[in-house]
Amino acid sequence: MNACLVFFNGPSLNDYLTLPKRFTEIGCNYIESIRSSVDHVVCYDPEMRSQIPQSSTKTYWCKNGHRSDTWREICYPMIDTPQCSGTLAVRLALQLGFSTIWVLGCDWGHSDQSVFQDRYRSQSAKKYSNSKVRQMDRWMKDRDIKIVNNNNLAFKKKPVPVAEFIAVYGL
């Protein structure tokens, strides 16, 4: 299976931190501090990149137009411009050619918290906008992108229940 896991930073991420590694893993911002097996780290905000410690065993990615010696660039057409680290991570999974993308830790419409909230300067705020939801809905319509969550979220496509993901994942 040409699949990957994409880790968003919602509270449900904590439920997946001890999963054994089976697929390529893409995470956002400080993910390495809580899950060392991640392969790719994505950061949307250019000013935050200097706060993320780097390892020689990981690949670091940023949005279009912000690459550096240690940060590679995720390329996308204007219609697919990501608006946060989570959507940027999904866009990277698409760029890398994964046919199945499992999204873990996405709690849009259920929680506005981040597992890294104490590291951010701003207070907790709504993690999604209508345009972010429409973008994810558009991507999920034509591709095998599965949001794993037991709650009803903001998307048109229903989330995959956690038990179903666990069965497919082989636990």
Features from the language model and the residues they span:
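Metal-ion/cofactor- or nucleotide/acyl-coenzyme-handling active-site neighborhoods
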Residues: 1-171
